[in-house]
Every structure is written in C-alpha cells, then in structure tokens.
C-alpha cells in the first residue's frame, strides 16, 4: 500500500510530516549530516560514513571532472548508494557553488557578483539563474550555494567581488531575481549567504568580527535576505562566520531563531558554512567539544552541518538518544530538510538526466556574453573610445591582456580547478594539505616586492583546455578589428614591483597610435592570487609595477586606455591621470574577451553602472553613498572644510556612475500627487531621450531623502531603477510606483515605521548626477509588518 509520503499529489509539508513519523533516530540524524564526495575517492565510502542515509552531499569535487557526463555519473553512483542504505530510500540533496554558474567547466560561466550587479538588470539575472538551474539539475545537483547577499563597503575585503555591492535595494532586486530564476519549477533550491553582516568585518579581514548596530543589521544587511524570503520564497540560508556582538551566527539563537525565523519569518533550511559548527569549539571556544558545538548549533536552529561530519557526530546523536539534548530539535530540523527534498521532487526524480553532454546551448553562451558586456563600466572617456578608424596600430600591454585565466574570478570552476596545480588554496572550511604531491611540486617563488606566489606556468594552458572557445582580450580584439595591428608585450605582472619587462612594452608603445594597458590583480582562491576568499589587502590601489609603468608611459604622450580586471574597483591617481579612458571589466567569465573587444571597438555601447562607491584611498574606508546625514562626504558641521587635511572626503567615482558613447536627456520629474497616505503608493514619471547618434541603454535611478525625521537617516537611498533601451533620438517614459512601506525605518522603539513628513524624490544617472527632484508629503504614520514591506519600487517603461 502506498504511504502518504509516497503520494506526489500531497503537499511537500504533508509528505514530510508522514515520513518523519516513520523514521527512527538514526535515520533522522543522518538527515542533518553531509557527506563530502571527495571522500569517495579516498576510500571513505558513504555507506560506511553514513550507514543510515545522509541529508546532503558536497559535490565540489565535480569541479575536477572534465565533462557533465562524468559529474552525472558520480552523482548517480552516490545517490544509489545513499538510497539503498535506508529502508525509506531517502535521496540526498547534492550541493555546489553557483555564483558564476554551476562550478564545473562543463557549464556556462558568468561574471562575478559585482559584474552581475553592474548590469542593474534583475530580469537578466533571473534568466541567468534559470540557465544555472537547468544545467545543474541535469547533472543531478539540486542545491545552489548562491546568491551572496552580503553588503560590502570595504574593497580591502577579498570577497567583495562575490557581492552585489554596497546597496541593499540593488542587492535585494538582483538577488531575489536570482532566487526566483533558480527555484522556478523547483529545479534547484537557492541558498542565500552569509547571514548576517559578514563583509562588515573589522579591517576588511575575512571572518573578522563585524561591528554593526542592531538597527543597521536589520535596515541594511538583512534587507536582501528579507526580500528573497518574502518575494522569492527562499529555500535555504547559510550562516556567516563573523561574530556579531559576541555571538557567532552558527550557534546563535538570537540570530538564527529570533531574527531569521522569528522577525523575518524564514521557514526554510539553514545550513552551516563550511566547518562553521565545529569552529564554535575549535576557533571561538564557545563549546567544550565538537559534540557540544553541535548541540549549540542545533539549539540555535542550524539544520545541517556542511561539508562533512564533524560536530553533528555520534556523540551528539547519543546525547539526543539519552535525552541530554531534546529530540524535538532534531525533528524540526529534519522536517524542514524533508520538506525541501519533496519540494525539489527528489523522491520522484533523484537521479541526473540521461545524456547531459549538450546542456550548454548557443542561447546560454549568448546570454553569458550579453551579461559580460553589460557588466562593464566606462568610468572615464575623453573621446578616445570607441577606437577610431584612424587608429591603425595599437600597443596592448599587461598580463591580463593575453590571459584566458584573467577572465575568471573566485568561485569559478577554473579558479577551483587551478588548485590542482599545487598552490595552497584559501577557501575557508577546507583543509589545505601542505604535504600533498601537488604542494610538494608547487612553484613557491614570489613576485619581487610581494608575498604573492608566481602563477604556475600550467595555469594558462589549463584555462585554454577547459574553455577552448574563450578568447583572451588580445585575441578577441584581433578578431573584432582585423585591419588594426595589435602589438603585444606583457610589460609587468599583476603583483609586486618587477620592472624587467618595461623596456619592451615601452618600445611597442612608442610605435603605436594608441596604448591599451590591462590593469589589476589576480582574483581567485590560492596563494598566487591578490584577491579572493581569505585574500585581503591593506591597500586598494594598483600594484607598484603597474603604477610605475603608467608613470613612464605618461612621458610618451600617447592616448592610453586602461582596462581593469579584479574583484574590486580600480582606484589609482596615476591611472586617472594617465589614462584617457578606463573600462572596469571585473571578472567577466569565458565570454569576457569578446565583450571587451565589442565595447572598445564600438560594436557595443557600454551601459554598466557602479554598484559601489570607489574610494580614493583606503584611509577613507568606509565610504558609501547612502551614509547617514552629516557623515562621510556629506559633512555639514563639525569640520572647517569637507575634506581631510591630505585629501578630499568625496569618492573617486560615485555609486551608480557609468558613461556611454551617447548622451541621455531627462525631462521634468512629475508626481501624480504631492501628498500620500502612509500606507499608500507614490506614482511619478519622466521622459528620457537619447540625444546622441548611437543606440544605447540608460539606467535611470530613483533616490529618496527624508527632509526631517525622528531618527538620523541616510543622505539618500536608492528606491528603484529602470533600464531603458533607446535608439538615437528616441524618447521613452519611465513610470515609478513607490509604496510608502518601502520608506519604513526602525524608530526609537525598534518598530518599523512609515513616518509623516516631507520627502524628496530624486532621479538621476548616478547617485551624484541628479537630473530631477520633486517633493511630496507623507500624511500620517503607519507601522507595517517588516516582513511584508516593499523592498524595491516598481518601474515601467512606456
């Protein structure tokens, strides 16, 4: 007879409740554990480690496999072993990183998080996530460790490139779109991370304590998570490593139960960041043993420990059996895990699709190229771009220029795969084996003047083998402009102060009509990288070797274009002075070379906008556009001038900045009404016209400023935006609908409040390039449910 949990016509919740009631303690405990698939290659079978079944499988080892069929084969083998180990045949969830695509080289690659944010295109983000879900589930992967919802205001932090930048509204819009695209049709479950305040770590140091007030934690850092929970029906959340106010999220009831589940209404699955539960004992000394750390985490509401069995161990299981730890804690965790499995359809379809070799379609590649192209930001241009037909000879200089590897950043398949070449990796929660054969053969020589290990000479051949259709920037330029001669010299590396290549590079620059210099560091996961997870920096400028070269190049009086690759924005006085144009390329993925070539040659028009404020110097940090009144670069009192004694308060480039090859004109911002009830919706509109002779895309940005409030409020806040495609001379109408609940803030009693009073609405091409303003009055007060307030204003283009 069919049991209720076997009936697919019932809801996931009903099926999970029925199955839970049939499971014994051993079976239930297996569901909160994770098996690391790499152990299957080390003689540690899943049947031995998890004889009663297992909740999740870490499939990061799939990155080392060359094709989708091999990944699917591994998952099929493990899934069969897991399902055969228990009498209820419960399938496991297989998880992998998906920030820039499914983290295998057989899947489509996309730009890093900052690049995605720079498109300001939630609709495109949803399409990207749907592509990831289709490719991942075809291989048998059902849990995606993305998107990254951390708000980052510190470019010293090596993981900035994973984020959507500094603004909670932009992050909410982009991340919620990602969640919707990924979870559509229940192909995969999204896991948003890192809850909470992770990249507010002191000193820009990975896993360092985050000093954030309870108010800011909720208004800023929790907002993207709340939007995804409310509007995206988010399936899972991963904790932050960073301690907040003396509490570590992995073992904090206040953070996981009271805030996440209580205040924010999250009812999905919580999973630990790698090794975070055992670190409650080993690093933070909050527990007396691994099992005690497991108890703290389970009591706090941590459902599953990743990536392997450590604190959710046999000792903890026996403590539950004896009643020392309440079994009800285990039951509630397992109920959520089973519900997610039923929602994913794993009981009906536990295995990969057959014949997954051709999952990357031409449409997937075209989408990747389009996102890469629209992620790039023209920061500066005095007219040298696009390249004129009169430019016949171009000198191309820099390590990145002829490197396919340079197109990829952290949390990409290639960044993980290059760790097989023997440079110590930096991924948190993963033990690096210094005695491994790869490490023994590693090249440990560093770039002169730095502690960065020289790139293994095998990396670039590996990159070209993994992505045979990818072009370096130089290769793509030669294809895009066949009648232009492109001369190449490396000139300088990506770290240190080496100058031995200067002479050859300066010689080709002398002979050229224009010079393109690639700038920046090496974004990835190991000791040969300059930014990435666990790879933080004191300085935010270019490496000395690049700064000095630009100074020497300046004496030639040649037009110079700088193209910057990195996981944080370019910040250089020298580059600003020497370069006639600067293109921020981030880490654009496999299609990045072609995207850059299209932009430089004018076959495409840049439309990316900064998702972060760019500091002039690390001494300014934190510098961000939505700072509180009378703070940062909007000081109005307490200082004789709005500047440091040795520099300006103002940023190098402002949030939302980005140039185009055409010009856009904005007409008057008009409001339907100038008085709105506190529970009402403000409606407004304006016309935007392409006043140039080239088709382009403008990102129209809406900001608000509370003229007078009971709490200190930001000088301005992004509330919505619209991406407008315009032909030369074309005009379109942008309509805004702004629910007043989006203007709610926490009052003195920590209640969400929409407060009566005057508010200024602004529209502009950036946070500083404001093109129109209008004032309105909020009539009365309202106290909306914080879970159900508006997060991003609706815009329509007519």
Mark where each language-model region is.
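Short beta-strand elements
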Residues: 769-785
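Glycoside hydrolase catalytic-domain context in secreted enzymes
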Residues: 1-747, 756-763, 767-768, 784, ...
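Surface-exposed, short loops/turns at beta-strand junctions within beta-sandwich domains
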Residues: 752-753
